[in-house]
Amino acid sequence: MRKIGILVAAIGVGMATSAAVEPRNYYGKIGKRLADSLQKYHVLQQPMDDEISRRAWTNLVTFYDFDHSVFLKSDLDRLAAHELTIDNELGEENISFGYDIYNLYVQRLGERIGFVTNLLAVTKSWDFSTNETYRIRRKDAPWPETKAEAEDCWRKRIKNEVLVARINHDLDKSTNRLDVATDLIKRYRQYMTFMTEPDEEAVLQHYLSAVARAYDPHSDYMSPASKEDFDMEMNLTLCGIGATLTMDDGALKIVEIVPGSPCERDGRLQEGDRIVGVQQDGGPMENVMWQPMKKSIKKIRGKKGTKVILQIIPKADPTGTAKKLIDLVRDEIKLEELAATGHVETVTFDDTTRKLGYIYLPGFYESMGKRPNEEGFRSCSMDIAKCLADLNAQGVEGLVFDLRGDGGGSLREPVLLSALFVQSGPVVQLRDLRMVGSLPIPPGNPIAFRKPMVVLVDHTSASASEILAGHLQDSGRAIIIGDARTHGKGTVQTVMGLGPEKYGSFKVTTARFYRITGLTTQIAGVSPDIHLPSVFDQLDIGEESIPYALPSSRIQAADYRLSWDMHKYVKELRSLSEKRTSADEKFKKHLANVKGMKAIHDREEVSLEYAARKAQMAADREMRELDDEEDEDDEEKTEAKKRRRKRNEPKKNDVVLEESYKVLMDLIRMKGGEEVPEVKGWWY
């Protein structure tokens, strides 16, 4: 019988829970205003009825216990009393259910984590020789009938985590001491802190978001704090100290320091230092150990020009005996890792060398609350126009525009981006509650880039990405390359306030958008001209997999003409690409990786027997490493990934990008130096 010993630290086995969270007295008014506003502005014009109530109830239960392992069946029976009454309760300004379910969740989670800490403290060794399995996907499993049944689920969960740690240790051939129990107790303590210490505003957000998403998955409630985060992401700016943070043993660990930030200019804070206290606005030093990360970060952020004092445990002295205080003046931080970037790539293929442009766009951003002519206004179309000017100056012969992983953003930006490549005509059609109309490229538009281009997409490219890719494809301006289809989001959201600032805002789906052909991207997405799959290609992560997604539809095509003639080259380009990739050993390995990731994603159950699981994990690890860095040790890999993240560069050995460059080279050769012609007039 094979048994594996685990070192156990002397850690307390009890797990205290927080006091019950209660709503503020005006929160009921927020709930009623949201309910009224959703009925008034949502594109479906659906009343707040029993069906919406049922959906909201399901959303909330799923949010708190997605894998059916915290609540008991008896809890669900009790909660079911509200399944068809949420609509009525909101109309009466009653939001107590949102707090009742949260407080019950905290109670049950405390019991589960208490069981985990006790189990880890008393278990001296684990038996991994028995033919036992662990169900890793429980979203369709019945809720446990009894406490004992729930604890058995958690026993298997912990046994699985211990086994995974042990096998990884063995596969790495590590000589380091393995202390799984201590690590897991710390992790679950942090998880308990994260889930059980939100304030009353966060609980309100969870509840009202469940209500909004009952209409469709992209409608949402935003508390004042969430709206602030949303604006920061769209503006690419925040006011703070300029450090990327993560939780580490209860403290905020500095992972990375933003170039040009107060942290970098001051020079005293270093990567690896841990923040354990924050003093702001002349107040007392507040202990932030084991606080939810969002709360601690909110204390560190603040108005530009104000001072914050941090209590630090230096990386050089992790014992904490040499704590020190560091005062910093907050400043505006540019979130450059979210901005568009471009560079020139020199590519040699078939004895021909060409300079090609590459642009990566992680999101469709624009400054919120500012007009384009105001100082400080920034948008992705402005940044990409600068990139294109630079690429043109360097004499590139074509462009790869990378939209992989781009989840969208501003609706206006894909129209302005299309105008950089297409001279005139409609870009996208919108249908709202009143009418169907088009968003066109303004007349007299000068094209910024006239040379051949390909656009890269994947299954996570969504919304504004799909508008841009779909328009460039439909107008014959670009060749689309990537996964079998994009995400499939074809709806437009509008952000509105709910009254006083403390009431927050809501995001509501007010329109659907359609391609100029009349087809929708809703559910269907954008299909590529050349299918080069990523690891996301076969995963169930598209719009159709999200509860309550709106159905697809179509409308009449807009009045448009082709801006160029890319379509006639697709068949030959596809044939050449298929011939290359079918003979390319590296691409064959990549395709095996795609299939392997699908198998891992669909896996419902895993073995808890050591030998069988080790063989499976070794095979999974080998498959995952197929597309990873080559010829780099671990430290070099980490640094390379950091550099790429800062510059938004694609990963090394990106076989899809490599083949896309070759497709672009083929296209340039076929076009024979031809560029997009200038056309006089408004419509083609």
Annotate the PLM regions:
Residues 19-22, 36-49, 193-200, 216-240, ...:
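Cleft-lining beta-strand/loop regions that shape enzyme active-site pockets
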Residues 20-127:
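Charged, amphipathic alpha-helical regulatory modules used
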Residues 31-43, 81-85, 186-190, 362-368, ...:
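Acidic/histidine-rich, surface-exposed loop or edge segments in extracytoplasmic proteins
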Residues 111, 115-240, 249:
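Extended, domain-scale alpha-helical bundle/helix-rich regions
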Residues 2-8:
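Sec-dependent signal peptide recognition
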Residues 10-18:
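Hydrophobic h-region of N-terminal signal peptides that target proteins for export
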Residues 119, 136, 170-186, 516-684:
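Conserved functional hotspot residues or short segments at active or partner-binding sites
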Residues 62-63, 84, 103-114, 124-160, ...:
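PDZ/PDZ-like domain segments forming the peptide/carboxylate-binding groove
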